[in-house]
From Swiss-Prot:
Its EC number is 7.1.2.2. CDD domains: ATP-synt_F1_beta_C, ATP-synt_F1_beta_N, F1-ATPase_beta_CD. InterPro entries: AAA+_ATPase, ATP-synt_VA_C, ATP_synth_F1_bsu, ATPase_a/bsu_AS, ATPase_alpha/beta_chains, ATPase_F1/V1/A1_a/bsu_N, ATPase_F1/V1/A1_a/bsu_N_sf, ATPase_F1/V1/A1_a/bsu_nucl-bd. It catalyses: ATP + H2O + 4 H(+)(in) = ADP + phosphate + 5 H(+)(out). Keywords: ATP synthesis, ATP-binding, Cell inner membrane, Cell membrane, CF(1), Hydrogen ion transport, Ion transport, Membrane, Nucleotide-binding, Translocase, Transport. One of its GO terms (molecular function) is ATP hydrolysis activity. It is found in: Cell inner membrane. Belongs to the ATPase alpha/beta chains family. It comes from the Bacteria. NCBIfam families: atpD. The gene is atpD. Produces ATP from ADP in the presence of a proton gradient across the membrane. The catalytic sites are hosted primarily by the beta subunits. This is ATP synthase subunit beta.
Length: 480
């Protein structure tokens, strides 16, 4: 079949208009390649575009997946005959790829046997799996208060600088290194430095082996802050396509980490404006819910294999009612909300146990004891929150004996919900802790039952199990 070739007629930043013969206009989401053959340019142009709009009379408006520096009118645009296709399969493990599936790790080409388009249908309703099984993360506050669902979708919500990426990196460290299946990390519009750190940490942890990729268990797909909006909008789909292949063809339990889903929405807003759409609430794109739904509906577990996804969600100006985080909420099985007031108290991870939720925190899934302890912890923390105004105005001495005891236990619980992380060890100097769920439930049960009312609250800070707390209390006693 003869090549379908068009001509670039307008370049305005990442938006490019291309003229084709009307009979051979490429379809929406088709990929085009612009080349600088015959043009005298300092660096050769070889840029992938994605068709977004048909303007009529053979003209299509496209969004570039790479910078359009040096592109001029008159350049050739070759229709690639289908959507952007990326390499998938075991050959992607250990590699760092960009939105169009090209390696960016200077380790040579990806020798993949299979390529798949990034635009695909979500699995049919009757193919989806509906099991309910808890997924242990080793992070106390998560396992106790908002347990993660195996094969579910989890959101980490937080404003700027409260620790979303650190929590995601700890989950990767705890889960990817102990987990038997494959992991895919999609870096969507986040810092390049964090992407580099993660790649190096994966090598140290043995999750990636750059000397023998066949021993690696993770693939990294990056579209960082420096990329044009087209790349940031589509890189989540590229990562998801790699994860879908492991789920459907390998039947593997796959982990998909996305940092940050808000940048996906932000890039969509930029693209929407470039395409001339009328903005909707707070300046977001009018198709925000549709775009989010198309991505989220594909992140699911089927009868062949599971995809458990953990998504960081930036909350602009700490406003949970902002359309971007509010639209994401609807798709999740568990939400972990990171709180600025807690991070200011030095409690890390700064998870707000009262604002975080999980669909599987029920006796039927986690067991009666776990459920009762989690509700007991929430009850004590809620009562403490209710009493804070009285304490601020009148002082703690004006409380009843019972309320003073509740406040004392709540402060211990709050401190005990902190935990040293492996990935933060180099900053804190405290070795990381992985806490088994049985130890976590037992430890908190003892605290809320009042077995450790005599232990000073400072002993509970940054500890793993109750045994470590008692050991610290003995040291404090001996030092007096």
């Amino acid at each position: 079949m003869a090549e379908n070739i068009g001509t670039v007629i307008q370049v305005s930043g990442p938006a490019v208009d291309v003229q084709f013969p009307e009979a051979t206009m490429p379809g929406i989401y088709q990929a085009l390649r612009v080349v600088s053959d015959g043009f005298d340019v300092p660096t050769p142009i070889n840029v992938i575009l994605e068709v977004q709009q048909h303007l009529g009379e053979g003209r299509v408006r496209c969004v570039a997946m790479e910078a359009t520096d040096g592109m001029v009118r008159g350049m050739k645009a070759i229709d690639l005959g289908g959507p952007i296709s990326v390499p998938v399969g075991r050959e992607t493990l250990g590699r760092v790829l960009n939105v169009i599936g090209e390696p960016v790790d200077n380790m040579g080409p990806v020798q993949a046997k299979v390529h798949m388009p990034i635009h695909r249908q979500a699995p049919a309703f009757d193919e989806q799996a509906t099991g309910e099984e808890m997924f242990e993360t080793g992070v106390k506050v998560i396992d106790l208060i908002q347990p993660f669902l195996k094969g579910g979708k989890i959101g980490l919500f937080g404003g700027a600088g409260v620790g979303k990426t650190v929590v995601i990196q700890e989950l990767i460290n705890n889960v990817a290194s102990k987990h038997g299946g494959f992991s895919v990390f999609a870096g969507v519009g986040e810092r390049t430095r964090e992407g580099n750190d993660l790649w190096l940490e994966f090598q140290e942890a043995g999750v990636i082996d750059i000397h023998d990729f066949s021993k690696s268990k993770a693939a990294l797909i990056y579209g960082q802050m420096t990329e044009p909006p087209g790349a940031r909008l589509r890189v989540a789909l590229t990562g998801l396509t790699v994860a879908e292949y492991f789920r459907d063809q390998e039947g593997a339990d796959t982990l998909l980490f996305i940092d940050n889903i808000f940048r996906f929405t932000q890039a969509g807003s930029e693209v929407s404006t470039l395409l001339g759409r009328m903005p909707s609430a707070v300046g977001y794109q009018p198709n925000l819910a549709t775009e989010m739904g198309e991505l989220q509906e594909r992140i699911t577990s089927t009868k062949k294999g599971s995809v458990t996804s953990v998504q960081a969600v930036y909350v602009p100006a700490d406003d949970m009612t902002d359309p971007a985080p509010a639209t994401t909420f609807a798709h999740l099985d568990a939400t972990t909300v990171l709180s600025r007031p807690l991070s200011e108290l030095g409690i890390y991870p700064a998870v707000d146990p009262l604002a975080s939720t999980s669909r599987i925190l029920t006796p039927a899934v986690v067991g009666q004891e776990h459920y009762d302890v989690a509700q007991g912890v929430k009850r004590i923390l809620q009562r403490y929150k209710d009493l804070q105004d009285i304490i601020a105005i009148l002082g703690i001495d004006e409380l009843s004996e019972e309320d003073r005891l509740t406040v004392s236990r709540a402060r211990k619980v709050q401190k005990f919900l902190s935990q040293p992380f492996h990935v933060a060890e180099q900053f804190t100097g405290i070795p990381g802790r992985y806490c088994k769920i049985a130890d976590t439930v037992r430890s908190f049960k003892e605290v809320i039952e009042g077995k450790h009312d005599s232990v000073p609250e400072q002993a509970f800070y940054m500890k793993g199990t109750i045994e470590e707390v008692l050991e610290e209390a003995e040291k404090m006693q001996a030092a007096k």
